[in-house]
A protein has these predicted regions:
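Solvent-exposed N-terminal domain segments of exported/luminal and surface proteins
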Residues: 24-152, 335, 515, 526-589, ...
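Tryptophan-paired
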Residues: 65-150, 205-324
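Bacterial Sec-dependent N-terminal signal peptides
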Residues: 16-43, 206, 325, 330, ...
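C-terminal, surface-exposed recognition/capping segments
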Residues: 505, 583, 592, 597-807
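Short, compositionally biased
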Residues: 294, 338, 342, 349-661, ...
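Extracellular beta-sheet/turn segments enriched in Thr/Pro/Gly and aliphatic residues
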Residues: 159-200, 207-211, 314-351
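Bacterial N-terminal signal peptides
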Residues: 8-17
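Ser/Thr/Pro-rich, low-complexity mucin-like regions
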Residues: 199-201, 209-215, 285-315, 330-337, ...
Length: 807
């Protein structure tokens, strides 16, 4: 038979062609005591595509779509389709396998393979005789499978027979087909047999039209996604494939493309609007076309954009089944980037379609593309959250969804007090927040997903020229155990990969030039909260610093010491309901800094009458005198994924060392908050971890200096840089200074009054860990101009810089 081009399928597993000549009858897979009789087999191929006068198996699922339509936008027509098969090629039959099953017992009685000449639709075959009424299956264009199905095999198993297929053009392959006759009487019908064949694949054709009214859409990729790997030869009521059983077909990215694919009965639902056919609303394994490219509106800026077209019945928005012998013709006209069309995905996806989510997204401002998106229906990393630390008051399942209907800017920095970090923030119908970068080369912003006026969740956008998320610079840290010390739990020798700078900073370079030093500060976080606060905007020694230029959604400049509330104004409760109320307030008000109320020290709030909780969560008192810690304290311990090994007895460093990222973790995807022991190499003292002796500072030689005058701090001219440079591994500088980490004297925001304090005196970083079972404090790195404390403690209401470790 003449070999024809086969586009889109390649049978991988079962092409065992026997050495038969044209029209030669093959050798049957039969035991010797089964009698056979000659049969004249006649075949026809039921058309996949037909005209009014032609009947087809299921018909033409033709679909005309307009994607992302905006007012006044028109489109060019598609060119001639290339690379697909002609109708004759789609009908061609090269060879056949015949399988005869007895209806009484459902067992294989006989099988045979035969090759056919070009255009031949009849063949002289043999079938078993005298075995009663049978079902005869004919498989075409699949090679010789007779040795793959043993004599006596059950028909039920035969129906599960499948080949693995992949994308590509299979040279010399025609479309696999299947047909059968259920009532062949082997006693009387041996003279002839007629079987109609249908293709075991579906045909997907895309005709793409693009804008022609001044807008430009440049196609970079056209792919068919979620294609079933398995091609079942016989149609059955198979369930939808699993994710592991799916693959992707590529193309030559032209405007007219055809694929031939196995069926994928993904299912259906109640959708009625075609614009709602996007990932959150469709079966997870549904097959779809993904068109990616760059869209440039007339007079506008290019933006990355993707269009998704889910396959299914052309007249039913809720149908997502791709069935065999069916043609799916998609005539798609691109007419804009309207985000009210759920099939339109504007901007580069930072969240990998919701599979790589976090509370912080990092964007490289040197990228030519300025439009980005991330899935805004998932809280943080989507981790399962127990009711103990849930802002909803109940357990939150993993990857639970929220349902925003709009998005807004919360705050942003403006470079030079002019250039905005973001130019646009919006919410798309398909559950993404979309934003466009502003003119700032470095910046920070917080954006929120809302339902009406209520904030459901918010995210930190960190923009920088230094890297994107995949290029974040890290350094190796090693711990330095001093086991056997009183008051400290033993730790083990470990290594971490930690960011080389504070989260949100523009630089990690040690300096004492004001403009450059301010770039190293990053942003501040209260212990256990996911949302950042603006850092100091000065390089001076002050306890009431001005902050970097920051503006709210209305363009109003945010003043220092503003947008604050005492925790007692939220609630003075001390039970789980009160914890829920405070966590919910923090989530719904990401701009608001929550001050502590020291009146929570009284016995009425579970205090000892002397010591406040010093926490932004009211009445978070630790365990004391064999008394359990309060409910708020126990919740606060776990917000960032650490906790105490024993909430009654744990010593310092007796925390959960294996930090598990929570929905409140402020770090980007692939990173999480560090444990308390991460900085233990910063001192060399052997009898403790903390020291004020400069000879025990594990720093570069120039930083072995103390200035004990608090008002002077790092302004002292003997300090070469605005902070300290520590060795993260070993006791000396490695080649290239890769083990030297700079911690700037960025100060912090004070949890008592909200002032930005200790700028030029303290270099800090939060850990994820509470300090100990008897402490209300959180564990952190505490470095002043006169001491180094790798294992220190402080008020959890304070807001400090954060430096994340790689997962």
């Amino acid at each position: 038979m003449k070999v024809t081009k086969f586009f889109g399928l390649w049978i991988l597993s079962v092409l065992c062609v026997l050495s038969c000549t044209d029209e030669e009858q093959g050798t049957g897979n039969i035991v010797p005591d089964v009698a056979t009789a000659p049969v004249k087999l006649s075949l026809d191929a039921t058309p996949m595509w037909g005209t009014v006068s032609t009947t087809r198996a299921r018909g033409d699922n033709s679909l005309d779509l307009v994607l992302g339509e905006e007012a006044g936008k028109t489109a060019n027509t598609a060119g001639t389709r290339a690379g697909t098969l002609t109708d004759t090629q789609e009908d061609a039959i090269n060879d056949i396998c015949v399988f005869q099953f007895g209806n009484a017992d459902g067992k294989l009685k006989y099988s045979e393979y035969a090759s056919l000449t070009d255009g031949q639709l009849t063949a002289n075959i043999s079938l078993a005789s005298g075995v009663g009424t049978c079902t005869v299956y004919v498989l075409a264009n699949v090679g010789d499978l007779t040795q793959k199905v043993a004599y006596g095999s059950a028909v039920a198993d035969f129906k599960k027979f499948a080949a693995e297929v992949s994308s590509g053009k299979g040279t010399g392959q025609n479309l696999p087909m299947c047909g059968y006759k259920t009532d062949f009487n082997s006693e009387t019908d041996n003279a002839s047999l007629t079987v109609s064949l249908t293709r075991a694949v579906a045909k997907v054709s895309l005709n793409l039209t693009t804008p022609n009214a001044g807008d430009v859409f440049t196609v970079t990729s056209v792919r068919l996604m979620n294609v079933a790997k398995k091609l079942y030869y016989v149609e059955s009521a198979t369930t939808a494939p699993t994710v592991a059983e799916l693959t992707t077909y590529t193309s030559d990215n032209t405007k007219s493309i055809a694929w031939y694919v196995p069926e994928n009965k993904a299912g259906s639902n109640s959708l009625t609007d075609w614009k709602d056919r996007y990932e959150d609303n469709v079966p997870a394994t549904a097959t779809y076309i993904l068109i990616e490219g760059s869209y440039t509106p007339k007079g506008g800026i290019a933006r990355d954009v993707a269009y998704t077209i889910y396959l299914g019945a052309g007249d039913k928005a809720g149908d997502f089944n791709v069935v065999r012998n069916t043609k799916y013709t998609i005539n798609a006209a691109i007419k804009g980037t309207n985000m009210n069309d759920g099939r339109v995905l504007v901007g580069k996806d930072l969240s990998a379609a919701g599979t790589q989510t976090a509370n912080c997204y990092v964007v490289n401002t040197t990228d030519a593309n300025k439009w980005y998106r991330f899935k805004a229906t998932i809280r943080g990393n989507g981790a399962a959250t127990s009711a103990q630390i849930s802002y909803t008051g109940t357990d939150i399942p993993a990857n639970d969804r929220i349902a925003p209907d709009n998005a807004a800017l919360v705050w942003e920095t403006r470079e030079g007090d002019k250039a905005p970090t973001l130019d646009y923030v919006g919410y798309s119908r398909n559950g993404y927040i979309v934003f466009k970068l502003g003119e700032a080369t470095e910046g920070n912003a917080v954006v929120a997903a809302k339902n009406g006026a209520t904030t459901l969740w918010s995210w930190h956008i960190w923009t920088t020229v230094a890297f994107d998320r995949n290029g974040i610079k890290v350094q190796t840290y090693e711990t330095r155990p001093r086991n056997g010390l009183a008051s400290y739990a033993n730790i083990t020798k470990r290594e971490f990969k930690m960011m080389d700078r504070n989260l949100g900073s523009a630089s990690g370079t040690a300096t004492k030039v004001a403009e450059e030093a301010i770039k190293t500060y990053g942003v501040y976080f209260q212990f256990g909260r996911k949302d950042p606060f603006p850092a100091a905007g000065v390089m001076t020694r002050t306890n009431d610093a001005d902050i970097v230029p920051v503006y709210d959604a209305n363009g109003n400049k945010i003043l220092k010491n503003s947008n604050q509330i005492k925790n007692s104004a939220i609630t003075t409760g001390i039970d789980q309901t009160a914890v829920k109320a405070q966590l919910a307030y923090a989530v719904e008000n990401p701009l608001v800094f929550i001050l502590r109320d020291d009146n929570d020290k009284t016995a009425a709030y579970g205090g000892d009458g002397t010591n406040p909780s010093y926490n932004w969560i009211f009445a978070a008192h630790p365990a004391k005198n064999d008394k359990d810690g309060s409910v708020p304290w126990k919740a606060s311990n776990k917000l960032w994924g650490s906790g105490l090994q024993d909430e009654k007895t744990s010593l310092m460093l007796g925390t959960i060392a294996d930090v598990k990222k929570t929905i409140y973790d402020p770090c980007p995807y692939g990173y999480h908050m560090p444990p308390q022991d991460v900085w233990t190499n910063f001192t060399t003292i052997t009898t403790a971890y903390n020291t004020g002796n400069v000879t025990e500072y594990n720093v570069v030689a120039a930083d072995k200096y103390n200035q004990t005058n608090e008002s002077t701090g790092f302004t002292d001219g003997k300090f070469e840089v605005w902070g300290r440079r520590f060795f993260t591994t070993g006791d000396a500088e490695a080649a290239g200074a890769g083990n030297v980490a700079f911690y700037p004297a960025a100060g912090y925001r004070y949890g008592y009054d909200g002032h930005v304090s200790h700028v030029g005196w303290g270099c800090y970083a939060w850990s994820a860990s509470p300090y100990s079972a008897t402490s209300q404090y959180g564990g952190f790195l505490d470095t002043y101009s006169s001491w180094v404390r790798p294992v220190s403690n402080t008020d959890r209401s304070n807001a400090f810089p954060v430096r994340c470790v790689r997962d």
